[in-house]
A protein has these predicted regions:
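Intrinsically disordered, low-complexity segments enriched in small/flexible residues
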Residues: 95-137
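Conserved catalytic cores of soluble enzyme domains
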Residues: 1-107
Length: 137
C-alpha cells in the first residue's frame, strides 16, 4: 500500500456495520486517504475482543451507542483518523473516491505521521474510561 503511493493515492472506504478491525484497520491506516460512512467502525480490535480482554463492565460490546461513539465513522472523522465523513450512499461514496484520486497525494502521508499519533496516545489519561468528547481532543 505504501509503495503504491509513489504512483497515485490509495483510498480506503469503510462503510457498513461490519467494521474495519485488526489487520484491515492497519491497512486502512496506511492508505493515502480514509473515507468513512456513519455506519463505519474503525479500530485495531473489535468490540467483542476488547470486551473479552477488559471485561463487560469496562467495554460492553452490545452497547451500540457507546461503541459507535468511540469507533464509529463520525467519531473517527471528528478525531482526525478519517479524511471524509460520507452518507451511506453509493453515488456519494463513488464521487468522493474519484475526488480524492483527483486530489493527488497528501503533502504528508498518514504512514509518515507516526510520531503525531504516538504523541496523541501519550496525551491520553489511561486512568479514566474515554468518552466521545475525550476521544475528539
Amino acid at each position: 500500500i505504501v509503495d503504491l503511493q509513489r504512483y497515485q493515492p490509495v483510498v480506503a472506504v469503510i462503510a457498513g456495520p461490519v467494521g474495519c478491525f485488526g489487520g484491515m484497520s492497519i491497512a486502512a491506516g496506511l492508505c493515502s486517504y480514509v473515507l468513512v460512512t456513519r455506519e463505519a467502525r474503525l479500530g485495531l480490535n473489535g468490540p467483542q475482543v476488547i470486551e473479552q480482554e477488559a471485561g463487560i463492565a469496562e467495554y460492553d460490546s452490545r452497547d451500540r451507542p457507546f461503541i459507535w461513539s468511540l469507533t464509529g465513522g463520525e467519531q473517527r472523522f471528528a478525531s482526525g483518523l478519517a479524511d471524509a465523513y460520507l452518507a451511506d450512499d453509493l453515488d456519494e461514496v463513488r464521487t468522493s473516491v474519484l475526488a480524492y484520486f483527483a486530489k493527488g497525494l497528501p503533502a504528508r502521508p498518514r504512514c509518515r505521521r507516526a510520531e503525531d499519533y504516538l504523541r496523541r496516545l501519550g496525551d491520553l489519561d489511561t486512568a479514566e474510561q474515554p468518552d466521545a468528547a475525550g476521544v475528539r481532543r
